[in-house]
């Protein structure tokens, strides 16, 4: 209903290397009628045809980008399908903007502003009931699709942001734990069942460090590892999660600039061998990545400079001077760029 789905879904599909399909257009093609013509026979007729198309598309293998019309959410079977088979992103745009975009068009719901506003308010609750994430721009859609949450102050809401309801093991290094560990523990609340420390830096990415962590862990298959720290911590803890009990969920909470804009995004996890770095690992996507730019305020200058080198590289690839942005926008933009690359090539095949 004027939220910009067509524009954003098209751009997202291009960035993520996915096929985009417009559900309304497929309904028209399979029916041999336009949407207004179908609606003339009654909205229930359209909803039946829409459901048939949704069942087909959501049952196909592979990753598709599906653009549903705003009214699809009123169908209980479609809501159930979206909960079970899709990552659903709600494009949340204010009602005035939506009406301005569609008024005067031939859309069935664009003929009466009062009715449009009533439906807008009514459907918001339905959107919220199925949405996995909310976005209002392309970066937001990319981040949501990759399971990346960027928010200043997110560490304080960590308990809300870690998916599931099972116990959590917090893994960090001594330095980061000393600065942010208590806040993370308080945020996790009753879900926190155990805490563990890995050595700082590359020492975390050794078999000896992970062997000790695996032996200390007491989580079951319903537990989640939360990795709070820089790229070495998230690399190691992610691989620990990938191998422990043949794989349990994990959530990186990167605290360094390098990790926030690059290392902690996507499914690559690894440890080192004497012969070289990252030689043993697994692709194990986090159930969510929680990025709090406020954590950068305690970052030593040397680590910030290291991170800015990654920002400059990302900016050059993106064709934008990202290094000129303030921290919050810089992190969000770089994270979205990396997330798009990971969505396009999740197994780093090049």
Predicted regions and their residues:
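Active-site segments that bind and position negatively charged phosphate/pyrophosphate groups
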Residues: 324-350
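ATP-binding Walker
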Residues: 3
């Amino acid at each position: 209903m004027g939220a910009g789905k067509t524009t954003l879904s098209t751009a997202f599909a291009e960035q993520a290397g996915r096929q985009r399909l417009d559900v309304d257009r497929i309904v028209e093609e399979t029916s041999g009628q336009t949407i207004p013509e179908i609606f003339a026979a009654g909205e229930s007729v359209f909803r039946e045809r829409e459901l048939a198309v949704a069942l087909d598309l959501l049952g196909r293998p592979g990753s598709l980008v599906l653009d549903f019309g705003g009214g699809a959410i009123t169908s209980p079977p479609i809501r159930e399908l979206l909960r079970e088979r899709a990552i659903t992103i709600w494009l949340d745009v204010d009602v005035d903007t939506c009406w301005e975009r569609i008024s005067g068009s031939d859309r069935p719901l664009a003929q009466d502003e009062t009715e449009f506003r009533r439906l807008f308010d009514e459907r918001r609750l339905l959107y919220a009931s199925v949405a996995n994430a909310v976005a209002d721009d392309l970066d937001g859609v990319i981040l949501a699709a990759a399971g990346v949450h960027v928010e200043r102050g997110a560490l304080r809401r960590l308990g809300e942001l870690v998916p599931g309801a099972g116990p959590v093991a917090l893994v960090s290094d001594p330095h980061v734990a000393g600065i942010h560990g208590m806040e993370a523990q308080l945020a996790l609340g009753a879900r926190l069942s155990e805490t563990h420390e890995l050595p700082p830096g590359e020492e975390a990415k050794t078999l000896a460090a992970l062997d000790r962590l695996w032996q200390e862990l007491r989580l079951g298959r319903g537990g989640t590892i939360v990795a709070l720290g820089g790229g070495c911590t998230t690399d190691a803890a992610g691989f620990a999660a990938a191998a422990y009990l043949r794989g349990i969920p994990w959530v990186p909470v990167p605290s360094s600039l390098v990790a926030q804009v690059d290392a902690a995004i996507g499914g690559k996890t690894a440890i080192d061998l004497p012969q070289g770095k990252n030689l043993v690992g697994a692709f194990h996507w986090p159930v969510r990545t929680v990025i709090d730019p406020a954590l950068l305020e305690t970052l030593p200058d040397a680590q910030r400079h290291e991170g800015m080198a990654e920002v400059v590289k990302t900016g050059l690839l993106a064709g934008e001077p990202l290094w000129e942005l303030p921290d919050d926008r810089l992190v969000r933009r770089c994270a979205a760029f990396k997330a798009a690359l990971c969505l396009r090539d999740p197994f780093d095949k090049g």
